[in-house]
Amino acid sequence: MATILPPPGTALFRHFTRQSLATIERLKEETLIAPKAGAHEEEEPPTPNPDLEAGKSLPMIFGDPPSELLGTPLEDIDPFYKAQKTFVVVTKGNTIYRFNAEPACYILSPFSLVRRGAIKILIHSLFSTLIMITILSNCVFMTMSNPPAWSKTVEYVFTGIYTFEATVKVLSRGFCVGPFTFLRDPWNWLDFMVISMAYITEFVDLGNVSALRTFRVLRALKTITVIPGLKTIVAALIQSVKKMVDVMILTVFALAVFALVGLQLFMGNLRHKCIRWPIANETASELFNGTVFNDTLSYNDTTWLNDTLDSNSTFDFTEYIENAENQYFLEGSKDALLCGNSTDAGKCPEGYLCMKAGRNPNYGYTSFDSFGWAFLALFRLMTQDNWESLFQLTLRAAGQTYMLFFVVVIFLGSFYLINLILAVVAMAYDEQNQASQQEAKEKEEEFQRLLEQLKNQEQAQVLGSRASLTSKKSVSLTGSDVADDEQSLENNEALKDCNGRPIPRLIIRAPTMKESAADYELREKEESSVHSVLHLDEPGLRERSASVATAAASVATAAASVATAAAMEELEEAQRPCPPIWYRFADIFLKWNCCEKWVVFKKWVHFVVMDPFVDLAITICIVLNTLFMAMEHYPMTEEFDYMLSVGNLVFTGIFAAEMFFKLIAMDPYYYFQVGWNIFDSIIVTLSLVELGLANVQGLSVLRSFRLLRVFKLAKSWPTLNMLIKIIGNSVGALGNLTLVLAIIVFIFAVVGMQLFGKSYKDCVCKISSDCELPRWHMNDFFHSFLIVFRILCGEWIETMWDCMEVAGAGMCLVVFMMVMVIGNLVVLNLFLALLLSSFSGDNLSVGDDDGELNNLQIAIGRITRGGNWLKAFLIGTVQRVLGREPQKPAEEDPADEGEGKTEGMEMNHLDGFKLADGIANCLVGGQPSGVTLDGESSITVPIALGESDSENPSEDDDDQEDDVDSEVTCEENEHHSDGVEDEFGVLQHVKLMGALTDGDSSVCSTVDYQPPEPEVQEEEEEEPDLVEPEACFTDNCVKRWPCLNVDISQGKGKKWWNLRKTCFTIVEHDWFETFIIFMILLSSGALAFEDIYIERRRTVKIVLEFADKVFTFIFVIEMLLKWVAYGFKTYFTNAWCWLDFFIVDISLISLSANLMGFSDLGPIKSLRTLRALRPLRALSRFEGMRVVVNALIGAIPSIFNVLLVCLIFWLIFSIMGVNLFAGKFYRCINTTTAELFPISVVNNKSDCVALQEATQEARWVNVKVNYDNVAKGYLSLLQIATFKGWMDIMYPAVDSREVEEQPSYEINLYMYIYFVIFIIFGSFFTLNLFIGVIIDNFNQQKKKLGDKDIFMTEEQKKYYEAMKKLGSKKPQKPIPRPANLIQGLVFDFISQQFFDIFIMVLICLNMVTMMVETDDQSPAKEDFLFKVNVAFIVVFTGECTLKLFALRHYFFTNGWNIFDFIVVILSIAGTMLSDIIEKYFVSPTLFRVIRLARIGRILRLIKGARGIRTLLFALMMSLPALFNIGLLLFLIMFIFSIFGMSNFAYVKKEAGINDMFNFETFGSSIICLFQITTSAGWDTLLLPMLNKEPPDCDPAFENPGTDVKGNCGNPMMGMVFFCSYIIISFLVVVNMYIAIILENFNVAQEESGDVLCEEDFEMFNETWEKFDTGGTQFIEYSQLSDFCDALQEPLRVAKPNRQRLIEMDLPLVIGDRIHCVDVLLAVTQEVLGDTIEMVAMRESIEAKFNLNNPTSASYAPITTTVRQKEEDMAAVVIQRAYRNHLHKRGIHHAAYIQRSKTGRKAASEDAPEKEGLLAKKMGALYGSDADLADEVEGLRRRPDPQTRCSGARCSPEPPEPNIILVPVEITNELLLHSAPSQQSSPTQTILRETNV
């Protein structure tokens, strides 16, 4: 954070003069000299203050600069620039501009008049406005597809204005030299480019002008430079694009691999068509009478045919098969029907044969014939655009088995990679968000300090002027009496006390009607002042400084100091947006307190209007009004229509009356301060306007505004409120992003129109049979915009084919891919990221702090209480009549206490008037009723359960104790009148008393009621197995029927008990459970055989019927056994047992029906399908599945909540759709061609009916999915929201005219806007909410189960994770190097990293050669590729052979080697036997693709690939969870496919149902359901189900092979089936998949952000293996230094490292060896730093390692490195000390001998050394033996070999002057008692150091 702002005030602003320039130059010189002087004291470099950046507003603290200084050059106010040549200019709006003080363009100095004029123009607000208007006008002109002649002149004007702008900028700033000049701002490059292009295209002829004109569209980007805030969003986008690089690389790589697989599997397949056969031509048919053509023609054998036919020139076979007339086309299809020659591929109809002919489907663009097209097809699959079409084409041509390929691509490619992009964008957004929050927080802290300073200065004055705030009479800061809770703090911000706890808003005052008008008025005014203190939300204030607002808000909400609040109020008054006169006007005209009677009347109105019952009534009216609007349909009777219109009038009246009375009760001034009231007033006004304009044509859309009343429900429905808030917040936050998106859409729409518009016009016949422009084209701006919008929705491929056909493939691909990647993958994902960030755990459990919600609860509470009283009264009356004594409440069973009874609860925070009814009876005669003042007893206040805010009346002790603290703040309420104060004291006492006893209620307030924190529960343990059976029946049953109480100790009872024990033993046995699971799986599998062919397979049918009886019998036996074993009580309290019971019942019923002959009854058939639920029970036994199911069940409430909210949200669009389109989708069609009659022939229904009677060829039909009523509207909206079948709804909508009129092509074009708006709000928002809800739910459930790391700090978690990773690994024993010389050399060669990389490069080259392959390639190319492939096989075989030779049998210990070996064997076999393998299996080239997996190995070697490794790691982490979800999904598909088979097997084959994709067999059902799991094509499967009567279907249709008649569908069943499947699979299960990926990506990201990761430990192990060749897990201490140096960062300890290694204190075992775990722990600690808490962690990791590695038994340390070093040092110190001691003794003795020789010895002096070694030797040296002395002297003069310290041994240093040298021979004997030397003691040393 930059330094604190300079001292505030205007004295800081000084004119920029020549003197200022001189000062800057002087300072600059000083700064240049200063570094040389004090280089060593350099602090961190200063940074510019972010608050004073150019373009920012001047911070408030500076005040307003004097007017004469505005717009003139001033000295720079940022201290950072004091020594730089810059100056600033501040505009009238206090915006800062910074300029370079060097002469602009070397000519204009800062003091030049021209430059000053240019600056004045540049900073003027009108200048930017002019530029903005110019850009927008220019954009409007660019949207013209056929510009008028004069537009050229306008173009010149625009260019002129842009040139003028650039000139002004250059003159004021300079061109490019120095900071803050024109070209130093990257945004100005854009301007420069645009202007340059304008002049270049004008003066230089560059050919294709329209392509160059598209450059003009970049001018739209200039809006980004002009609108503040857009630059930051663009920066965020660029940031996320940078972060996406890794994902993009991974995606491209994965797509390339899949494309290669696709290329090998499906090359040429999509050209197999059905050709008419036999040939009608006689000459040809003679040729083909051979037997070959009685079978199907094999794929590519047409060549010999052509050779055969060459001789016969009259018939050209190629031309015959290429001719479209000889190919089989389905009705309405542009492409011929595909077919295949494998058994499960599509078959040709009679008279046709499957051959390869013609081009590929979709203009030839959909194919796998070359790598490029295969890649495009895979990209399409990954983005899931119209992929069902590709899926169906491929399966039809290649066979249904290949569904597996699509499953893999959809799950890995689509779900995983696309959502990784979302995860990355979300993370980038999140990081930026956190950074900005951090910045704001720092700013606020800084501002707080400044504010403190200000406050101290002004305190005395403030306290004097605002004393009224603290007066006794004043209202407390805790609430407001005037309005209902709507008047409370906006955004429901609770007030807080000094501890940050919420202050209750409760004001207990007996509601009295006697309060005088004056008091009322005074109180109201005081409240308003407090209200305004707490509402610093004025826009003016916000504009000046966001941080002030936040600081002010935090000061106000702290509510610790009234003085601060007063200061802030003054501050606010200064910043009020309106002049004071308006406030005076408001006081006079908008606060209605004219006379006392009026005030009393007003209070009565307030009392009534604000009553909870009125709220309840209004809510009921809203619901009824919504129902009335939803009842509109087509066709309606007149009576019904009249009823609806009357209803509308009534509701409009009710809502108008509510608004009117609220205005009276609250005064307009306060009424319009509440958001909901403004919302109400707008709707009421619009409703009234609509009544007036009811008959005006075209204004019926006003009726739609009434629908917004539905949103009023949000006041009383937290989830809807949350949704609206989230959308509100997002739209607010998205304001800038939406603008960016709009600019992107605009630019691409214009680019498309400019580049391709002409081509669409000229080449239209290529894509349209009638040569009219199709609906999707780019010839004008609106249609071009629609295409771009459609691409944003994810549908790009179909429009791109059209574009490629008319305008060429290259350009279209570039433009469409850019829109797709930039618009869809980046910007839309940023939308979603923003939406997800709006979610937090609190959002879904929205607190009840919304006033209106309490009102509803109170009203419902009263009703409940009334109902309970009535019930009790009636029961009492009946009992008295019957002569019984009514039960006293006191005697009630404690268990039932609180159910519907009044109970002591926390009192609601009700304002004065709300107390009128609900709590009035608490306060009777100045004492709270229900409060006993007996000191002993606990005290409660009666309140109806429903009236409480809290959902959970009894809290835990802890919570209550906490509450005591927070709620003591109630004493702030002593601002009330004295009478209430007394009561209040009691109430406080009450509260404290209540807190002592569990379950008693707090009386003070529940405004701060938080639901108790979810307890950290341990995951439910499996209940311990019961040893014997429990009781059969519950205690109540036994009480009621005593005969059930059996004595089990004797007689029959004992036998019964033994029987139960036996059954229990059987049931509890593992084998029993396994057997039952096996039976369940078998019975489920049996269901899959009951398809439409069952009647033809009599044997199978008989077997299945018999098996069904057996299964039923087994399950009944199982159920009975369990009843006997467990008893009814246990059995029927288990949900899985209930499921079992339900399924067994179904089986029994259907079996009984079969035996009685009722098997053909519809209900019985439906019941049979419910047997498909059987697998659920088996899967309840699988742990993984159960986890997913539990998670799902946990999420169901939230999912339903959101589903309900979505339905309400969609209801508005559905009703609007009914208003706009009901009855308008009907059309008159030609029954033979299914084409529409033009309006010139048929104008309306009556014309059509007449034509039908005349010719029988016309029919008046409706579109199947329409808006004729709200339910159908919902279906339409679901199709639009999933983007499936939405075209079939949009086209009739834009063609519609009026009810019962024939539609006309695009006559109602702007109806597209309805769909665009719905897609944005109904699809982008609400569907993505599901992801938000599910992710949020997962996180909440995690919290509930308790993260295992709750009790660890962040640092410890990192440590823990690191430890976890390294504990699970151990170094492997490396493969020993062979003793043989040649083998050894080869071993060294293949162990090199270079060898690995070389092989990887070869693999990649091999892939490249595969990519070059195409369908129908020339023989020469084929031959060349074959040879290259053989060469590669030889190389890889060579690699394999070398490894086998060098590694011997160890080769097979590595998984990768085995993998390589198998691939090589398969490749060789594939080359040799390619024809046989291809005929019976898949193409052998696939084996080469498998080799790509090896590239995964190289990722570890590349440092830059860490990001990609993270992504793959995230995938690996997700796999187990994804497998569980996959299982669940399969289960759902299984159940639905069985259900589909029994209900939709015989529907008419049309739309999406055909011979291959249908519900006739289990296989084809599963294929259809897999397809619609991604919501693809579900609309086409639904359409045939909607046929219910002729002529759409034929009820008498004969289905061959069965006795089932008819091919009509069941519309209701179809809609329920498909909608429920879409919601369950597409919205819930698939989103769980996404949630897991996002979660794991975040985890992986955190892990990769850790200092140490998995790879570092692997690298450690690999390095260790090189040093510990025996795999002993120990190395020599002497090797440690080299080992630590050989490690890679971050674990490396570089040389010289001896000292650091010793300090690590590593344990040594016998033989000075060190264990790997010790070294690893030590280097890890070096990286992470040392903390005390890690001791326990180390112990646990060592224990874990010992567990994993039994080899470490010998791991018993005897010393450590530090200890060893200490011992060495100790030895040296002892030796030195002993030597010094000997020197001293020697010197004493030598001096004595010398004195003896010279005769100076005193007579009484004795020899110091009388006996011992020293005396003996010195006697020998100095006593008598002179020769010996000379010899020693000679020895002394020899040079000494040892000079310096080495290790722990220190050698003698050279002698110093003035030292007497006494030669002493010290032998081993002499050193006997010294410390042991480190290595070996020298036998002879000469002692030289003698200090005298």
Curated annotation (Swiss-Prot):
IV repeats lie at residues 1375-1673. Pore-forming subunit of a voltage-gated sodium (Nav) channel that directly mediates the depolarizing phase of action potentials in excitable membranes. Navs, also called VGSCs (voltage-gated sodium channels) or VDSCs (voltage-dependent sodium channels), operate by switching between closed and open conformations depending on the voltage difference across the membrane. In the open conformation they allow Na(+) ions to selectively pass through the pore, along their electrochemical gradient. GO terms for cellular component: voltage-gated sodium channel complex. Disulfide bonds join C274-C339, C348-C354, C765-C771, C803-C812, C1228-C1248, C1593-C1608. The lineage of its organism: Eukaryota, Metazoa, Chordata, Craniata, Vertebrata. Residues 371-395, 781-801, 1271-1292, 1562-1584 dip into the membrane without crossing it. Residues 145-151, 205-210, 267-370, 396-402, 632-642, 697-698, 752-780, 802-812, 1090-1102, 1155-1162, 1219-1270, 1293-1309, 1413-1423, 1473-1485, 1540-1561, 1585-1614 are extracellular. GO terms for molecular function: calcium ion binding; voltage-gated sodium channel activity. Residues 1767-1796 form the IQ domain. It is a multi-pass membrane protein. III repeats lie at residues 1052-1366. It catalyses: Na(+)(in) = Na(+)(out). Residues 948-971 have a biased composition (Acidic residues). The sequence contains 4 internal repeats, each with 5 hydrophobic segments (S1, S2, S3, S5, S6) and one positively charged segment (S4). Segments S4 are probably the voltage-sensors and are characterized by a series of positively charged amino acids at every third position. Residues 1-125, 173-186, 228-246, 424-612, 663-676, 717-732, 832-1071, 1122-1135, 1182-1198, 1332-1394, 1443-1454, 1503-1521, 1638-1892 are cytoplasmic. Belongs to the sodium channel (TC 1.A.1.10) family. Nav1.4/SCN4A subfamily. Pfam families: Ion_trans, IQ_SCN5A_C, Na_trans_assoc. I repeats lie at residues 107-433. This is Sodium channel protein type 4 subunit alpha A. It is found in: Cell membrane. The chain crosses the membrane at residues 126-144, 152-172, 187-204, 211-227, 247-266, 403-423, 613-631, 643-662, 677-696, 699-716, 733-751, 813-831, 1072-1089, 1103-1121, 1136-1154, 1163-1181, 1199-1218, 1310-1331, 1395-1412, 1424-1442, 1455-1472, 1486-1502, 1522-1539, 1615-1637. Glycans are attached at N208, N281, N294, N341, N1230, N1244. Residues 34-54, 884-905, 945-982, 1836-1856 are annotated as: Disordered. One of its GO terms (biological process) is membrane depolarization during action potential.
